[in-house]
Regions:
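A Rossmann-like FAD-binding core segment of flavoenzymes
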Residues: 68-125
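Core beta-strand elements of the Rossmann-like FAD/NAD(P) dinucleotide-binding domain
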Residues: 2-11, 50, 112-121
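Core Rossmann-like FAD-binding/catalytic domain of the broad FAD-dependent monooxygenase superfamily
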Residues: 1-3, 16-17
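Glycine-rich dinucleotide-binding loop and its adjacent helix/turn
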Residues: 14-73, 78-80, 90-97
Length: 125
């Protein structure tokens, strides 16, 4: 038998899975990166990143959330890379922002402003 149920809510979340299929960008030299490159789609917990330097590519809400979670769980340093504009967030010590990724040379990542930094892992959001 079917029973109709009516309920009222203050808020409703519609999670349709629009971003279910990960977008995996390709940068020059990414194949030389010795660490792990993983999409947030496959991320399960921050523990594997404890003590590591992590680059989070994508600085919108999911990227910011992931970056803060990694920081709180003990990542050595977390950088969020943005494409359009910086988020202008007062990040805690051990976190920062960088412009768009331009390429990799081993563990060293080059950003759009010419700056470079070394990372142990890259998470794509």
């Amino acid at each position: 038998t079917r029973e109709a149920v009516t309920e009222r809510f203050d808020r409703v979340v519609v999670a349709t899975g629009h971003f279910h299929t990960p977008h995996l960008p390709s940068w020059p030299g990414v194949e030389t990166f010795p660490g792990q490159v993983q999409h947030a789609h496959d991320y399960r917990s921050p523990e594997p990143y404890t003590g590591r330097r992590v680059l989070v590519v994508g600085s919108s809400y999911s990227g910011q959330d992931l970056a803060l979670q990694l920081h709180r769980a003990g990542a050595a340093h977390v950088t969020t890379a943005y494409r359009a504009r910086p988020q202008d967030i007062a990040w805690p010590a051990g976190m920062d922002e960088a412009p768009e990724v331009q390429g990799f040379d081993g563990a060293e990542v080059t950003f759009a402003d010419g700056s470079t930094a070394e990372y142990d892992a890259v998470l794509l959001c």
